[in-house]
C-alpha cells in the first residue's frame, strides 16, 4: 500500500531562486536533456521570481517538510494565440515523482490560468521527459504538429495544447 506524501504548494518567493535553478538543471541533466535551446541554458532560470512578476504569470513551488522539491508555472509567452498561456518549468526532484505532486502543480496552474482569463494552455517538452509527457496526455493535452509562440526553446520538439 502506497502512503500519501504530505506536501504543500505555495507561490514563488525571491529566496527560492537558487534551489529552483538547481532543480531545473539537475532534472534536465538527469534525463540527458541538458542541451542548447532548453531552459538549462536560459538565463531566466536563475531568477524565476523576477520572471514571474509579469502580468498574468504565476509560479508555484512544491515543498515536503519545508524543502523545495519542485515547481511549475503559467506564463503569457510572446506570440501565443489570443487566450493562450504556456505551462512552463515543471520540474520535480526524483523523490517527488509518482506522488501526485506534479499533477497537483499542473492543476494549480490550470486554476491560475483560468483566473487570468486564459482559455487554452500550451506546453513544449522533449521525448527525454517521457514520464511527464504521459502525465500531460492523461490531463488532456493533445499533440500539435508545430510549435506556437516564441519561447526561444528550439531544443523542445514536442508541442501540446489543452482547452481549459
Question: How would you describe each model-predicted region?
Answer:
Residues 1-6:
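Basic/polar N-terminal segments that are highly enriched at the extreme N-terminus
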Residues 7, 11-95, 106-108, 112, ...:
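Acetyl-CoA-dependent GNAT
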Residues 18, 99, 158:
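Glycine-centered loop/turn positions within well-structured domains
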Residues 67, 80-81, 93-107, 114-116, ...:
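Conserved glycine-rich acetyl-CoA-binding loop
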Residues 119-122, 126-164:
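C-terminal "cap" of GNAT-fold acetyltransferases
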Amino acid at each position: 500500500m502506497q502512503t500519501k506524501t504530505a506536501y504543500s504548494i505555495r507561490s514563488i518567493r525571491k529566496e527560492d531562486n537558487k534551489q529552483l535553478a538547481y532543480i531545473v538543471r539537475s532534472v534536465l541533466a538527469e534525463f540527458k536533456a541538458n542541451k542548447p535551446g532548453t531552459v538549462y541554458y536560459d538565463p531566466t532560470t536563475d531568477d524565476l521570481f523576477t520572471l514571474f512578476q509579469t502580468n498574468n504569470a504565476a509560479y508555484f513551488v512544491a515543498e515536503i517538510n519545508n524543502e523545495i522539491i519542485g515547481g511549475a508555472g503559467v506564463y503569457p509567452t510572446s506570440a501565443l494565440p489570443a487566450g493562450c498561456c504556456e505551462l512552463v518549468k515543471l520540474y520535480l526532484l526524483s523523490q517527488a515523482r509518482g506522488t501526485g505532486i506534479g499533477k497537483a502543480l499542473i492543476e494549480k496552474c490550470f486554476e491560475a490560468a483560468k483566473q487570468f482569463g486564459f482559455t487554452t494552455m500550451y506546453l513544449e517538452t522533449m521525448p527525454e521527459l517521457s514520464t511527464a509527457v504521459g502525465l500531460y496526455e492523461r490531463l488532456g493535452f493533445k499533440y500539435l504538429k508545430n510549435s506556437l509562440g516564441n519561447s526561444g526553446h528550439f531544443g523542445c520538439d514536442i508541442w501540446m495544447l489543452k482547452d481549459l
